[in-house]
């Protein structure tokens, strides 16, 4: 039956590579990927997959291949000959936003229309033909129990699973596309209270028993933490299932920031076009259509060292104590394929997740936080370090002199809302003319720089929580935040070249224009607290220099040429390597009624500090090995 279905699927897809026209009538049939093999065959038939039959090592080599193929705009990759492993592996399934749309081409428009109806219920009776498929889509959102599933076809040992290691200093092998499922200990049979998240899983290394234990790294503001707390309060183990593969909708749902009342399983059902089936048992609910499942229990009071791991900020997440699972079962489908991704300094494949998430959630934002029209977590800056927002300024519309008022209320609401609360820098403005494009990052920043008053518009949050993966702060999860809120008319022109009379103190040199109004300068290596005097010398030197009104922002860094080479370079180093409360300074500092401000320019010390995590660097031998592959002239070589 599966062969017949697959043959029919191939005939349907033959020659069809473009996503369905979003304006066309909804199709009755929806592509329902039930396994990674279904996904692979779908991509193959759309000329979006290459197959690598040569042996490839999952220890660093496979990850380097994936990074290169993604950056060169390549297709998905199926590795059929994995060294030391009997399972094929697949990567780059989300190779681009276009490919992600292709995977969900029969359901994405339905999800959009479902969102439209949720935002405006009156749209349904007004346009019944447009929303004719909404009731059926709503039915697919109800997860259901089943007694068994395809994932239970075979058992294997934990050590037989693919041992993917992505970066040289990683503490072992990791699952990089995990679907971590936990049941609410207070309602274990209620699928609407199951949490699905993508929390990294360490399969081997450190002190883990390679056959019986896996590490679980979940951070602050993660749903599984609520279940962990409940299990701890009840003095019982937390039931957890880690699944890999199945419908790609499960992977997207695991990272989707969803509003209250909408669970990951309901969203996955809508996006996959079928109800999510979960296996009922004495264990946590298990996704029945997954390719692999690791099932077990977590002692809520016990931890083990987890990491290091090369993460999406472009640095290593260091070793820290985290929970671990005692493994009871390892299951896999017949003909299972292990999907994986590789994270590192953006852009990587998870960039596509962010793009699709923005596309789906942008219309929802105004309903979540009143007055906020749009938000953009900047991928190039590592996502959480920099958040841009467009709000509204309506408190005193009759006043000619404009200053941020309602924007500050909205900024506080943003920093108190779910995943948005992890933002370290929040730049917010209003847009009464609807002329600002929030995804045009350079233009957005320049819009604020033309209006900002550094004496008034800086609002620090000190000694607070920040993203677990951000090592710019004073400790794990500890640091500060800075809101930059600006409104009104432009008050300055921005320099389009280095001011001719610019003078710098000894040890600080090589000024480079990053973009209009922003300069990067090279400073001495940061060696300790004494190095903070470099910033004081710089501010004192600039105190009485004329011609700096058009340069409101200066970044002090280790390599100003690198910082100015691309906007992405500047975004990455400026916002990942600075802790606002410590590393933000300026010319003409004043503190009035405990409010810190400066005349300007504002200076951000984005030099590498001794407490920062090391950046991700490829292994030279592996790089040479992959370089050699690039000379073979095969289908893969052109992307290497």
Residue spans of the language-model regions?
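Extended, highly charged
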Residues: 8-13, 25-309, 313-324, 328-640
């Amino acid at each position: 039956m599966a062969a017949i279905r697959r043959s029919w699927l191939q005939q349907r897809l033959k020659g069809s590579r473009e996503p369905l026209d979003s304006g066309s009538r909804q199709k009755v049939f929806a592509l329902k990927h039930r396994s990674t093999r279904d996904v692979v065959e779908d991509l193959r038939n759309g000329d979006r997959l290459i197959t690598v039959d040569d042996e490839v090592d999952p220890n660093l080599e496979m990850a380097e291949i994936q990074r290169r193929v993604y950056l060169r705009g390549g297709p998905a990759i199926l590795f059929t000959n994995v060294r030391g492993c009997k399972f094929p592996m697949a990567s780059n399934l989300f190779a681009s936003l276009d490919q992600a749309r292709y995977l969900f081409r029969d359901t994405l428009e339905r999800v959009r229309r479902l969102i439209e109806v949720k935002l405006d219920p009156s749209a349904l009776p007004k346009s019944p033909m447009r929303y004719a498929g909404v009731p059926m889509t709503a039915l697919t959102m109800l997860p259901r129990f089943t007694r068994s599933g395809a994932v239970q076809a075979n058992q294997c040992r934990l050590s037989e699973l693919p041992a993917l290691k992505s970066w040289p200093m990683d503490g072992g092998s990791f699952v990089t596309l995990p679907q971590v499922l936990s049941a609410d200990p207070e309602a274990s049979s209620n699928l609407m209270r199951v949490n699905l998240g993508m929390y990294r899983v360490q399969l081997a290394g450190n002190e883990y028993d390679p056959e019986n234990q896996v590490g679980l790294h979940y951070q602050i503001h993660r749903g599984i933490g609520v279940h962990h707390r409940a299990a701890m309060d009840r003095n019982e183990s937390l039931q957890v299932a880690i699944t890999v593969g199945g419908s790609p909708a499960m992977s997207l749902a695991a990272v989707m920031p969803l509003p209250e009342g909408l669970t990951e399983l309901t969203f996955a059902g809508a996006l996959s076009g079928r109800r999510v089936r979960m296996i009922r048992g004495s264990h946590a609910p298990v996704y029945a259509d997954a390719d692999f499942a690791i099932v077990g229990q977590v002692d809520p009071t016990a931890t083990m060292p987890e990491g290091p791991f090369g993460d999406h900020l472009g640095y290593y997440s260091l070793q820290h104590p985290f929970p671990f699972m005692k493994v009871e079962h390892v299951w896999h489908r017949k003909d299972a394929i292990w999907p994986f991704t590789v994270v590192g300094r953006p852009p990587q494949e998870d960039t596509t997740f962010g793009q699709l998430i923005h596309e789906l959630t942008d219309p929802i934002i105004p309903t979540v936080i009143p007055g906020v029209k749009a938000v953009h977590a900047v991928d190039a800056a590592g996502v959480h370090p920099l958040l841009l927002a467009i709000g509204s300024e309506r408190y005193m519309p009759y006043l000619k002199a404009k200053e941020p008022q309602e924007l500050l209320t909205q900024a506080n609401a943003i920093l108190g809302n779910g995943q948005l609360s992890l933002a370290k820098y929040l730049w917010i403005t209003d847009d009464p003319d609807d002329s600002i494009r929030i995804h045009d990052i350079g233009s957005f920043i320049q819009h604020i720089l033309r209006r900002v008053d550094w004496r008034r518009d800086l609002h620090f949050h000190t000694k607070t929580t920040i993203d677990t993966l951000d090592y710019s702060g004073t400790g794990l999860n500890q640091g500060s935040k800075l809101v930059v809120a600006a409104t009104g008319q432009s008050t300055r022109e921005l320099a389009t070249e280095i001011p001719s009379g610019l003078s710098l103190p000894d040890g600080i040199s090589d000024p480079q224009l990053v973009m209009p109004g922003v300069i990067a300068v090279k400073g001495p290596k940061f060696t300790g607290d004494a190095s903070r005097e470099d910033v004081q010398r710089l501010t004192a030197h600039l105190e009485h220099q004329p011609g700096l009104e058009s340069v409101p922002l200066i970044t002090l860094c280790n390599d100003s040429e690198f910082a100015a080479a691309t906007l992405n370079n500047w975004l990455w180093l400026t916002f990942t390597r600075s802790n606002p409360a410590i590393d933000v300074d300026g010319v003409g500092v004043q503190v009035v009624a405990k409010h810190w401000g400066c005349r300007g320019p504002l200076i951000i010390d984005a030099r590498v500090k001794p407490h920062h995590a090391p950046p991700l660097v490829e292994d030279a031998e592996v790089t040479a090995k992959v370089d050699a592959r690039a000379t073979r002239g095969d289908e893969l070589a052109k992307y290497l």
